[in-house]
């Protein structure tokens, strides 16, 4: 049995938690290790028993962690674990953003690569980035990886000169789903724009337009459900703010759902929706995959890049241009055609191609 270290955004974010679920369930005979906070005791929905969550909460671990930080070697526990395992799978979406933590993130990955040797990157997009130096630094890093599979063509084009670079549609397109259910509510995934760099100035317009859309949907005879994908990124705060803007007499038509680690429950909530208004990236992907009409509100290029890859010709808005966020535009959108979804699911499987080969090798 091979043993693999998972590097993921372990913050009880539904999209990233689904990556972990899909990885563990696909490779039932592989033992996976994930460093996470104690909140991950609440993670539910992985149908296999092959994930060991390592918590940095014992006294000895805290001492080691502090020593590592003191000598400029943060995440030393991760390094030591990578050294004793068969490989590292870095699975996630926006995991290569140039920001104040870029240098430290790169050092950690470089050490993981040196210790873990067999390093796989699945489901990612590259950027946003500001400097060619950042891109060149990762060009050299990717060259040493066992496999790199991006989730959009834009990122692939940046590094396609490397033989080990591939791309497919988002991994979540290939998630095995329950039978489609026609629901009676419109599901909104809502974010707090001010929690993201560069969007605090549009927050008032964003909430006002969501309020108007909510009231118009209620007026049309449908109920509404506000859904949080990640408490840590202030989705719940955003929902409470929007609810406070809506007249109390309309609250009986509105419910809310806060994701706190139960993936199957969250997927059922999404599956029971009539349609989806998606600011969250994976609300958009899951809405598409569940054959729902989706109205995307793009907060980054990663969303518009994926829409372009899907040749999406329907209505959507962006945080940079909210003019199209209206009931008239929303009600025009339809579910994606079945042939596009089948192709997207097949493309999503591509991310696992090289990892399949590696984990199925004898020895």
Which residues fall in each region the model found?
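Active-site anion-handling motifs in enzyme catalytic cores
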Residues: 1-363
